[in-house]
A protein has these predicted regions:
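Radical SAM/AdoMet-radical enzyme domain recognition
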Residues: 82-104, 109-155
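Canonical Radical SAM [4Fe-4S] cluster-binding loop centered on the CxxxCxxC motif
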Residues: 36-83
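Short charge-dense sequence patches
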Residues: 30-37, 67-70, 120, 124-131
Length: 155
């Protein structure tokens, strides 16, 4: 269980179960039941690790009737470098409980996917992501089971 004390409240996160809770504003150590507006640093961070989508570029999504809000048919940017991801995680590791991996393409298709998940877990941050599932393999599913908190398949 990770616990973080802010000026007026306390938040806790269990990385094994995903249970999260935050107290209301505390005055003289007593719960007021007033909601704190926000933490001083994001407890959940969205990180776009994908710069392109191989399924979108192949036309598979279009054939399936799926319109990509990330313009996956035409985008051809590089995926995030592992060094850049590692730096982001090192800068937020003391304050962030979870990350949502995303970008233009399925995060599980990133060339360093397992390493990215391991970097998160080594920093006690739980990685989560949404995928089309089009490139999911048994090996990738096993990696997700080992490292991820939640994986959503959006077809």
């Amino acid at each position: 269980m990770r616990t973080r004390k802010e000026k007026d409240f306390i938040s806790c996160f269990d990385s094994r179960t995903g249970v999260y809770y935050r107290t209301g504003i505390l005055v003289n150590g007593k719960e007021t039941e007033d909601d704190p507006f926000m933490a001083s640093f994001p407890e959940l961070l969205d990180i776009g690790i994908m710069g392109h989508c191989r399924h979108g570029q192949s036309g598979l999504c279009l054939q399936s009737g799926i319109q990509c809000y990330q313009n996956g048919l035409n985008r051809a940017d590089a995926n995030m470098r592992v060094e850049d991801f590692r730096r982001i995680i090192s800068e937020c590791r003391e304050n962030t409980y979870q990350v949502a991996l995303g970008g233009c393409g399925d995060p599980d298709q990133h060339e360093a996917f397992e390493e990215i998940l391991k970097i998160c877990r080594d920093a006690e941050i739980v990685p989560n992501f949404t995928t089309s599932g089009l490139g999911m393999t048994r090996e990738t599913a096993a990696i997700c089971k080992k490292y991820c908190g939640a994986v959503a398949v959006s077809w």
